[in-house]
Design a protein with these regions (language model features):
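Long, polar low-complexity repeats
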Residues: 1-175
């Protein structure tokens, strides 16, 4: 499909979904069937297109099994910042750059979260799974908290919404 003005992309795979050796600049929403999962492998850079949107929303389980070494354009034979897709404001036409291998921003998973290898998430993981195995940590992954996600959370992730009453806009009906 085409591009979305807000950088939001919804995927409904028929099975599990594997993401590897890629840069995703947007909000990826993955809706999985029962017993399926998203696996993030190898080296990736996933970051939101809009700072006020989450990075990943996964309805199902997620396994972050990637390496925090740099994502290399040379090794992947791919240009990850072509014209129209800048990284830190820069584009080019040659596959010679490298980028941090990490997920940046808010990650929301409704099922079980597993973090392995040297996976790095720079942000917040909202794990909505239940039970003792809702979050599994193996090897030496990193979760680097980003305080701004608490003080200025992405849309729809607020703690509360205050709705002040405006004078003259309500009344109590008589019994």
């Amino acid at each position: 499909g085409g591009t979305n003005a807000d950088g939001v992309y919804i995927v409904r795979p028929s099975g599990s979904l594997s993401i590897k050796t890629s840069r995703i600049h947007g909000t990826l929403v993955v809706i999985l069937g029962a017993g399926k999962r998203v696996q993030v492998n190898d080296r990736v850079l996933i970051h939101p297109y809009r700072a006020d949107y989450p990075t990943l929303i996964i309805k199902g389980d997620a396994e972050f099994n990637f390496i925090s070494d740099n994502l290399s354009e040379t090794l992947a034979l791919t240009n990850f910042n072509p014209p129209g897709a800048p990284y830190n404001g820069v584009t080019d036409i040659l596959p010679l750059g490298s980028y941090p291998s990490e997920i940046q921003g808010l990650v929301h998973v409704t099922g079980i979260v597993t973090m392995k290898q040297t996976s790095r998430i720079r942000g917040v993981v909202l794990a909505a799974g239940t039970g003792a195995d809702a979050i599994n940590i193996e090897d030496t992954p990193e979760l680097i908290y980003t305080p701004s996600l608490f003080t200025a959370p992405p849309q729809w992730y607020t703690k509360e919404v205050r709705m002040p009453i405006q004078l003259g806009t309500w009344s109590q009906p008589a019994n």
